[in-house]
Structures are given as C-alpha cells and as structure tokens.
C-alpha cells in the first residue's frame, strides 16, 4: 500500500549518500555492460532483418517515420499503437523458468535479436536484480500464454528502448525500496509503435508506467544522451492499471505520458498521490474513457503552450486521500506553461467534454465549471477561456463510450488476465 503525503507536499528527490551513489553506479555499470554484450549479439540479426523488410529506425520522431501494419496488432487494439507489428511473423521464444537471467529466462528472450513472440510455460514471480532493457525491435510479449495466475515482473524496472513492441497481460511490480535506485515499474526510452494492453503496473518508485519520449544518441549503443529528446510516436496504453505507487521518496506517482499520435483509454489510475497522469509532451494528448481514483495533490496536469488535450468521457472519483473542498479535489486537468521559454504566457488548447467528477454535479454538467484549472502562476487570469476548444482535436481510432459505461467496463476488465482462475491478484483488485 502507498503511504500518502499531505496535500501541500511536493515531489522531492532523495538525498543520497556517497555510498548509496556508488552502489547505484556499480549496479548500473554492470547492467549496461551486460546489456551492451547482449546488444552486440542482437544487432547483426536486427540489421539482417532490416534488409529483409523489418527496418530498425532508432531516430523516429514523427508518426509516419515508422511503418505500420495493415491490420491491428490483435482484435481490440485501438489508438496510435494499434498497428504495431510487434513480433508478428518472427520466431517463438518460450520462457521456461523464473530466473533473473540465463537460458530460458524472460531477460534472455527480451534481449534476443530479431522479430520474436515471447510466450511462457511457467507462472509466478520473476525477481529481477537489475533492470531489463529491451533494445531489439519487433517483439510481442504474450503474458496470456502463462499458465495459472500468470507472470509478475518484480524487484526492478522493465525498460523498453526500441520500437514495435506489444505487451499484453503482464504484471509489473517494481517494489523494492533501495534508497539508491528510484525508477518506474514499466518505462524506458520507447521509440514508437508501442501497444500496452491489459497490464497491471504498481509499486513504482518514480512512476508506475511512463511512455512519452526517448533520448536519441546518433552514435547508438549508449543509454543516456543530451543530444536529442524526441517524442515517442504511435503509442497506446489500454485496459491497464497504474496504482499504489510507493511513497519512499515522497514520489508516489502514477504516470508521465505523451508523444505523437498517442492514446490512453479504458485505464485505471488509483491511489497515486499525483501524476494521474502527467502530460510529458506537446502535440495532442488523447485521454478517453479512463477512471481516476483517490489522488492526493495532483490528478491530471502538465503539457506546455503547444499542447492540445482531448479529455473525453473519463470518470474521476475522489477517494479517502483526496482533499475535500480544495481545487485539486475536483480537478479534471491543470494545463501548464510554467516551463515556457517565451517572454509571454501562452497555454495549450483543451477539449473537455463528458467527464464525470463524482460528488460535483455542476462540474459533471459542465467540465469547465471548475474542472479545468489553470496552473497557479502570476498573471494567469483570463487565459482559461482562450484555452477552450469546442471541438475535439484529431485523434487515432478510439471506440468511445459514456463515462458511466467506461467506469463499469474498467472496473470489470482492466488488467483482466486470460486463462487465470484468479484474473486479478490482490494488488490489482
């Protein structure tokens, strides 16, 4: 369970001792070395397949930079990532044990080069000692193939640093409270063509699940670069849970999301103090038919002066940790422009309609009657009406229902695992 902070508190990063910093650097240095070794083996296969029709496009920054399939990734796929190739047509790799690494492990399957479909003949908890970094493109992770109660990735982060990735019916429980390592349960530097479906992401130490940008290094082979910060493109997160982020660092946050041609629908954000979600990129942010429950000091916020928001038919349900009779307690969205480099204030545009704020009938009737709140900055009076759009911005295909129907659907179906006699574990319930 997350331990909630007072509504006035803001995110703070831990003050690390030199010993803790050295422990983190040692762990990541070793993992980078191992990942580089795996990538050196995978890259020739990736380049060979690129010549055969599966291009590797690490520099993609626009939706049309990445080719897309002619048919959806699976029946029911929607949004910007619906035409991801994933591992379609590639080899099938079976995970045969719950080991952190080695033959038959989930890590080995993820680090393998070439188009691949990862299936499981084991179920249980895969306890990681260091992050898994997926660098080779064209992969489908089919968690629904696991027997019993499915598979849970725990102990460390799962990072996607490539394109054309489909992940379904998986649990990511970062957990662990190593004071020297704070990160997401599920994140990374995703390039694009990303489809996340029916996953449960909890116990993050930064956010539970975040997809919005990738850091591109033209020299390749490196993990961090200040050269180019590019958007993730063609991304969908659907039917997924982001909940119960850990407050070890006063940072119990749900998600940072965004990118170009992105869509986030029929998901549940529950019992995270903030970032439910936060918008981490410009362009059009499509947030449709989601349920947000029990936030503390932040519901949905972010973006910049170039951002556009489609906030359509979502259900906001204040919980026991949500402050009553304060603006944040009935906030649908807080657009921001505080990081703008301009010498004058300009905010993005917002289309907000059909959202329910439980317990606030006036806001439910008119989302602009207190639900859309400008950031707290000097000289912002008068901007709210200028942000308002009376029509939705262009978005990828999303099957839209009413907020009431979305609430019922999400509570019954988000993170529902195929074949399991217990479709949700206690953390997802």
Predicted regions and their residues:
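Right-handed parallel beta-helix
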Residues: 138, 143, 147, 163-174, ...
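Active-site/pore-lining binding-face segments in mid-to-C-terminal subdomains
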Residues: 297-414
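Bacterial N-terminal signal peptides
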Residues: 1-4
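Acidic Gly/Asp/Thr-rich repetitive segments characteristic of extracellular carbohydrate-active
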Residues: 74-118
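Conserved small/polar residues in nucleotide/adenosyl-binding loops
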Residues: 418-423
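Extracellular beta-strand-rich solenoid/capping regions of secreted or surface-exposed proteins
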Residues: 107-114, 126-140, 151-168, 174-191
């Amino acid at each position: 369970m997350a331990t909630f902070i007072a509504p006035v508190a803001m995110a703070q990063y831990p003050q690390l001792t030199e010993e803790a910093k050295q422990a983190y650097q040692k762990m990541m240095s070793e993992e980078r070395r191992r990942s580089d070794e795996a990538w050196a083996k995978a890259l020739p296969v990736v380049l060979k397949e690129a010549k055969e029709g599966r291009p590797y496009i690490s520099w993609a920054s626009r939706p049309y930079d990445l080719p897309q399939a002619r048919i959806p990734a699976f029946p029911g796929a929607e949004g910007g990532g619906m035409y991801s190739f994933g591992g379609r047509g590639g080899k099938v790799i079976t995970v045969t044990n719950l080991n952190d690494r080695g033959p038959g492990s989930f890590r080995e399957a993820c680090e393998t080069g070439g188009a691949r479909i990862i299936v499981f003949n084991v179920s249980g908890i895969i306890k990681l000692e260091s992050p898994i970094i997926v660098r080779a493109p064209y992969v489908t992770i089919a968690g629904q193939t696991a027997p019993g109660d499915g598979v849970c990735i725990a102990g460390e982060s799962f990072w996607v640093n490539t394109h054309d990735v489909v992940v379904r019916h998986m649990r990511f429980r970062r957990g662990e409270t190593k004071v020297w390592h704070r990160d997401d349960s599920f994140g990374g530097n995703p390039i694009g063509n990303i489809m996340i479906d029916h996953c449960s992401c909890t116990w993050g130490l930064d956010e539970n699940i975040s997809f919005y940008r990738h850091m591109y290094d033209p020299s390749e082979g490196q993990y961090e670069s200040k050269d180019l910060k590019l958007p993730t493109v063609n991304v969908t997160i659907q039917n997924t849970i982001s909940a119960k982020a850990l407050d070890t660092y006063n940072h119990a946050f749900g998600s940072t999301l965004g990118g170009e041609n992105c869509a986030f629908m029929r998901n549940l954000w529950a019992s995270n103090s903030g970032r439910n979600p936060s918008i981490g990129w410009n362009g059009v942010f499509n947030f449709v038919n989601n349920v947000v429950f029990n936030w503390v000091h932040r519901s949905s916020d972010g973006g910049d002066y170039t951002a556009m928001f489609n906030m359509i038919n979502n259900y906001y349900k204040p919980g026991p940790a949500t402050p009553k009779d304060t603006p944040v307690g009935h906030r649908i969205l807080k657009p921001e422009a505080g990081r703008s480099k301009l010498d004058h204030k300009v905010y993005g545009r917002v289309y907000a309609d059909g959202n329910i704020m439980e317990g606030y009938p006036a806001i439910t009737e008119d989302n602009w009657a207190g639900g859309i709140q400008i950031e707290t900055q000097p000289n912002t009076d008068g901007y709210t009406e200028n942000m308002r759009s009376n029509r939705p911005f262009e978005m990828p295909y999303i099957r839209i229902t009413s907020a009431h129907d979305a609430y019922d659907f999400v509570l019954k179906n988000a993170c529902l695992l195929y074949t399991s006699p217990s479709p949700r574990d206690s953390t997802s319930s």
